[in-house]
């Protein structure tokens, strides 16, 4: 988001200024404020770190950029150690206590003593310190459940349970393949639906029925029948299209919007977001891992 904004400001400075576009540059400072708010009680000036898998991770530049913009440490699991009930960072001056970690590592890898024992990315003993309330983790372990696409079907009920209110925006009709009736409908209408694996991301494990061949649909039908819990389906939604420069021409391409929200003492919604664009003509897959791109998003 921040990179796209900088490119547009340099490329079209006059258009940008005349349009009075709301800034997104304060996101790192807002993130830092949120992380500071999460610090354990009685910690006045918390030491904060961004926990990254390392230089070979595809998002390493983002991790490095955010840590620099916030003025906090960028650390890997090998840079941290649990000692005397706290998490410490190894420095040239000895151990330095860490109070908050913005983790960019999946749950399974954050502590080999609790989760995957073969993990070299996390910190042994981290979860014990977390349970004692001596370090804050963002996002908290377990929040990755929201990545399970099946959860989407229950969002209206979740909103109703926690707020006593109805959802403002209706859900896209969603079919959960573990339900016999839903599964029968999905298998009978594969040519009309988008089918997604519950725990895949990046555009993988997905079937766009109207664009798939009969053989591809048959293969997916077999997967659904074998592991119904792992699949959900939705109608094929017509994504918005925007003009996109392709070579020396301007053509329409499908896009979606990924907003950014921070939840600290207050809720911050970034006045912009990441507009992801499918660069392949006719494609509905906007993920960067599948050849997608991104665009700056203006809120006036």
Language-model segment annotations:
Residues 1-300:
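Domain-scale recognition of functional cores that engage charged ligands
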């Amino acid at each position: 988001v921040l990179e796209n904004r900088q490119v547009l400001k340099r490329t079209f400075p006059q258009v940008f200024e005349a349009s009075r576009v709301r800034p997104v540059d304060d996101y790192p400072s807002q993130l830092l404020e949120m992380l500071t708010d999460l610090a354990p009680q009685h910690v006045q000036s918390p030491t904060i770190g961004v926990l990254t898998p390392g230089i070979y991770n595809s998002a390493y530049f983002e991790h490095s950029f955010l840590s620099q913009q916030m003025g906090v440490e960028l650390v890997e699991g090998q840079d941290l150690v649990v000692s005397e009930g706290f998490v410490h960072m190894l420095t040239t001056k000895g151990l330095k206590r860490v109070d908050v970690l913005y983790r960019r590592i999946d749950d399974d890898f954050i502590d080999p003593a609790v989760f995957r024992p073969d993990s070299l990315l996390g910190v042994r003993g981290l979860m014990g310190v977390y349970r004692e309330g001596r370090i804050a983790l963002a996002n908290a372990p377990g929040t990755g459940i929201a990545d399970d696409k099946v959860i989407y079907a229950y969002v209206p009920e979740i909103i109703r349970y926690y707020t006593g209110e109805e959802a403002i925006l209706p859900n896209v009709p969603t079919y959960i393949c573990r339900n016999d009736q839903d599964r029968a409908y999905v298998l009978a209408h594969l040519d009309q639906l988008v089918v997604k694996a519950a725990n895949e991301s990046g555009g993988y494990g997905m079937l766009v029925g109207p664009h798939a061949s009969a053989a591809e649909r048959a293969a997916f039908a077999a997967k659904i029948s074998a592991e119904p819990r792992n699949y959900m389906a939705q109608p094929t939604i017509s994504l918005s299209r925007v003009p996109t420069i392709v070579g020396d021409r301007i053509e329409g391409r499908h896009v979606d919007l990924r907003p950014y929200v921070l939840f600290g003492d207050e809720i911050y919604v970034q006045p912009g977001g990441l507009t992801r664009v499918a660069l392949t003509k006719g494609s509905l897959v906007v993920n960067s891992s599948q050849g997608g791109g991104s665009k700056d998003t203006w809120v006036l």
